[in-house]
Design a protein with these regions (language model features):
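Conserved acidic segment of CheY-like receiver
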Residues: 7-27, 38, 57
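Receiver (REC) domain active-site loop signature in two-component systems and cognate sites
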Residues: 51, 63
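Active-site residues of response regulator receiver
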Residues: 14, 60-61, 88
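PAS/LOV and related PAS-like sensory modules
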Residues: 3-6, 21-25, 98, 137-162
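Active-site beta3 strand of CheY-like receiver
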Residues: 52-58
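Receiver (REC) domain switch/output surface
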Residues: 117-132
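Helix N-cap/capping motif at the beta->alpha junctions
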Residues: 38-47, 68
Length: 162
């Protein structure tokens, strides 16, 4: 098993280090492919994103100096396709609406039980699997276009609906 190909690298931004550690423990219990790096601010998160490739960002909303929505907007400017999950205890319809407008991949409210980590782990798995499938489809499309552009053979495309 190739650990790099199967691992899921997650950047978790939360200004409460103890909670971030708890999240990492629960997520890794749900899926041992998860590699979680925690940061305590959006600016630290942006620095880490510029240094290391991640498969997904999970962020709190209520952080000092820059909110989770502002962090999301900064991530979208630089990494428009990177899955971003807002995982917050300060949720409201307004926050959810702002997150959707800013291009959040998913939104999940923190709860008091451990079931929330099962849901969060599932959502991380889903968004990273979807992104990887999209990237693979793009690579296949690019290779196919290169093959057809450089081929001396005639390629016939049939549309059954025409």
């Amino acid at each position: 098993m190739d650990d790099n190909a199967n691992s899921i690298r997650i950047l978790h931004a939360d200004d409460e280090p103890d909670f971030a550690e708890l999240v990492a423990v629960y997520l890794q219990r749900e899926d041992d492919r998860f590699e979680i790096e925690s940061v305590t601010s959006a600016s630290e998160g942006l620095d880490r994103l510029s240094e290391t490739a991640f498969d997904c960002v999970v962020s709190d909303h209520d952080m000092p100096s820059q909110s989770g929505i502002e962090f999301l907007e900064a991530v979208r400017e630089r990494y428009p396709d990177l899955p971003f999950i807002l995982f917050t205890g300060k949720g409201s319809e307004e926050v959810a609406s702002d997150a959707i407008s800013a291009g959040v991949t998913d939104y999940l409210q923190k709860g008091s039980g451990t079931d929330q980590y099962v849901v969060l782990a599932n959502r991380i798995q889903n968004v990273t699997q979807k992104r990887r499938a999209e990237q693979e489809a793009e690579q296949i499309q690019t290779r196919l276009e290169a093959i057809t552009a450089n081929s001396n053979d005639t390629i016939l495309t049939v549309d059954d609906e025409y």
